[in-house]
């Protein structure tokens, strides 16, 4: 006779992951030698990377992004999604958010020539396909990157506003706002900032709602080219 034995497993009722601490660790450990070209590869190949990881069962995978190597925990593989990730560990989602913040910090402090270099190299596919460009503001543009919602204060609530707008337009299910609604804002728990920062969220939503949203399959480079002939898309 076969005996099947089962034991109760204590549920993880609260997360100890702190995006601010994790981001500081990321900058300290992983940004030496990091270039805008490496970040460009990560974002323009984002869908391909995600698809590749979803097909591999390995828990830890090293990504080689044009020579910059970074190891991530593969939560994209269905069988790995419930695996606990260390607080200082990187996932594809965390890495995306960290790089978005890294770029914003650069944009806010570097020289104008370097800003132009960043804008020429970094393309946000999720923003571009909705007709949103760098001209709409760096905070807005970078807020379209997954993971930016970890830093609602840094990005001035734009990641949340983008999500709310998409839900209002029936372009996204409300359930996808859950992760954003669990985030802190400048140290404030969600239960606090959802009450005290309502005006700020509404202001961010006003900005997002006024953007020139339009679905397009034309690349940013193609739009710039056509604009020279008086064709705006």
UniProtKB/Swiss-Prot annotation:
GO terms for cellular component: helical viral capsid; ribonucleoprotein complex; viral nucleocapsid. The keyword Ribonucleoprotein applies. The keyword Ribonucleoprotein applies. GO terms for biological process: symbiont-mediated suppression of host gene expression. GO terms for molecular function: RNA binding. It is found in: Virion. Gene3D superfamilies: 1.20.142.20, Bunyavirus nucleocapsid (N) protein, C-terminal domain. It comes from the Viruses. Pfam families: Bunya_nucleocap. Keywords: Capsid protein, Eukaryotic host gene expression shutoff by virus, Eukaryotic host translation shutoff by virus, Helical capsid protein, Host gene expression shutoff by virus, Host-virus interaction, Ribonucleoprotein, RNA-binding, Viral nucleoprotein, Virion. RNA binds at residues 14-15, 18, 47, 50, 75, 81, 94, 123, 125, 128, 166, 176, 182-184, 217. Encapsidates the genome protecting it from nucleases. The encapsidated genomic RNA is termed the nucleocapsid (NC) and serves as template for transcription and replication. The NC have a helical organization. Seems to participate in the nuclear relocalization of host PABP1, thereby inhibiting host cellular translation. The N-terminus and C-terminus are involved in homooligomerization and play an essential role in viral RNA synthesis. Belongs to the orthobunyavirus nucleocapsid protein family. Homotetramer. Binds the viral genomic RNA. Interacts with host PABP1. This is Nucleoprotein. It comes from Bunyamwera virus. The gene is N.
């Amino acid at each position: 006779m076969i005996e099947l034995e089962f034991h109760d497993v204590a549920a993880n009722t609260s997360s100890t992951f702190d995006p601010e601490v994790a981001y500081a660790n990321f900058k300290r450990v992983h940004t030496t030698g990091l270039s805008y070209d490496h970040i460009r590869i990560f974002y323009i190949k984002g869908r391909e990377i995600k698809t590749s990881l979803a097909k591999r069962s390995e828990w830890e995978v090293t990504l080689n992004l044009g020579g910059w190597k970074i190891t991530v925990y593969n939560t994209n593989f269905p069988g790995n999604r419930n695996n606990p990730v260390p607080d200082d560990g990187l996932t594809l989602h965390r890495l995306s958010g960290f790089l978005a913040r890294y770029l914003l910090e650069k944009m806010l402090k570097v020289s104008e020539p370097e800003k132009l270099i960043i804008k020429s190299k970094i393309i946000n596919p999720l923003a571009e396909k909705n007709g949103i460009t760098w001209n709409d503001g760096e905070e807005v543009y970078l807020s379209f990157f997954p993971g930016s919602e970890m830093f609602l204060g840094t990005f001035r609530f734009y990641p949340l506003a983008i999500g709310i707008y998409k839900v209002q337009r029936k372009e996204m299910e409300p359930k996808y706002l859950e992760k954003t609604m669990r985030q802190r804002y400048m140290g404030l728990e969600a239960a606090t900032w959802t009450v005290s920062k309502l005006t700020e969220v509404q202001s961010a939503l006003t900005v997002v709602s006024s953007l020139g949203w339009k679905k397009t399959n034309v690349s940013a480079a193609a739009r710039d080219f056509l604009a020279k002939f008086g064709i705006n898309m």
